[in-house]
Amino acid sequence: MPAIDVGRIAVVIAGRRAGQKVVVVDIIDKNFVLVTGAGLNKVKRRRMNIKHIEPLPQKIDIPRGASDEEVRAALEKAGISLA
């Protein structure tokens, strides 16, 4: 299983956003991360428990705390879709 780090693409596995892909933008502590859908899906930037996401092998190169515009540009450059 890939590690949860900044720029990692993940799938939400719990809650009403289950099945949606997100990007990890920041690591808050050992239990929570900041994720975003970057405006490409219905997931807004929010804190999420790491037990509620499943990391995927894909990763994009973004700085910690990147804006949604920076995330969207990095996703387009890497050719990754969150839809």
Swiss-Prot record:
Which molecular function term from Gene Ontology is one that the record holds? structural constituent of ribosome
* A matching Pfam family: KOW
Domain of life per record: Archaea
- InterPro entries, A to Z: KOW (IPR005824), Rib_uL2_dom2 (IPR014722), Ribosomal_eL14 (IPR039660), Ribosomal_eL14_arc (IPR023651), Ribosomal_eL14_KOW (IPR041985), Translation_prot_SH3-like_sf (IPR008991)
An annotated GO cellular component of this protein is: cytosolic large ribosomal subunit
Gene Ontology BP term (one): translation
Keyword line: Ribonucleoprotein, Ribosomal protein
How this chain assembles, per its entry, is: May be present in 2 copies per 70S ribosome. Part of the 50S ribosomal subunit, where it binds 23S rRNA at its canonical site near helices 25 and 41, as well as a possible second 50S binding site near helix 58.
* NCBIfam families tied to this protein: PRK04333.1
- What family does the database annotate? Belongs to the eukaryotic ribosomal protein eL14 family.
**Matches recorded under PANTHER family:** 60S RIBOSOMAL PROTEIN L14, LARGE RIBOSOMAL SUBUNIT PROTEIN EL14
Q: What is this protein called?
A: Large ribosomal subunit protein eL14
